């Protein structure tokens, strides 16, 4: 596991965008796994800028988003469909048919989970999976006590996650209680994983992730089993790390 500790959110975003850019330059038909929320926003802004400057061509890139709220239509301002188009897809030359996001209003949600998993397998493998991390260590919407064997599935969100996401809604009552998410097994099949974290509120989750102790109580600890993980964190997210924990990882510049 490689760890990069950077100055602040902006530097985290820039360094993450550079890694995505390098991946696409190396493999123009790269399959990206994408995340939503405030953490990757800065990275998306840098990717848009790089595209406008002619540094990246997204025309052959394929994307799979980690998750989507159940009950929110694609045009709902808080749906992850809407988020991705507003903050990335509308500003780059990606083909619509190459964009994949779970359908949170599908008539048969269980079948939608199976369909999404089949589509990932049909394409092959995700080349670079981008992750954020929740305050409780969730990745995607895989909450504590989730089996590491899960594929794309329906999940009931914890109160902790609902409270963390209420800032995006007018009231906590509007926050969806369920979501479709790629499972831990789906995520771990990616060739490479890049996890981003910024801010002191993520420090405890990062500390648990880097302890090297696998526990279902902290879903992100499963990443220790993956052969190619890069974690980019700012100084505040790294603030609780000890020398012992840092000794377990490869620090990179």
Curated annotation (Swiss-Prot):
Catalytic EC class: hydrolase
Domain of life, source organism: Bacteria
Family annotation (SUPFAM superfamilies): NagB/RpiA/CoA transferase-like
CDD domains named among the record's database cross-references: GlcN6P_deaminase
Keyword check for Hydrolase: yes
GO MF entry, a single one: identical protein binding
Keyword Metal-binding: no
InterPro entries according to UniProt: Glc/Gal-6P_isomerase, Glucosamine6P_isomerase, Glucosamine6P_isomerase_CS, NagB/RpiA_transferase-like
Enzyme Commission identifier(s): 3.5.99.6
Pfam families registered for this protein in UniProt: Glucosamine_iso (PF01182)
Keyword entries, A-Z: Carbohydrate metabolism, Hydrolase
Catalytic activity: alpha-D-glucosamine 6-phosphate + H2O = beta-D-fructose 6-phosphate + NH4(+)
A Gene Ontology term for the protein's cellular component: cytoplasm
Active site: 67, 136, 138, 143
One of the GO biological process terms: N-acetylglucosamine catabolic process
This protein's pathway: Amino-sugar metabolism; N-acetylneuraminate degradation; D-fructose 6-phosphate from N-acetylneuraminate: step 5/5
Record HAMAP family: GlcN6P_deamin
Function: Catalyzes the reversible isomerization-deamination of glucosamine 6-phosphate (GlcN6P) to form fructose 6-phosphate (Fru6P) and ammonium ion.
Protein family per UniProt: Belongs to the glucosamine/galactosamine-6-phosphate isomerase family. NagB subfamily.
Protein name: Glucosamine-6-phosphate deaminase
Organism whose genome encodes this protein: Caldanaerobacter subterraneus subsp. tengcongensis (strain DSM 15242 / JCM 11007 / NBRC 100824 / MB4)
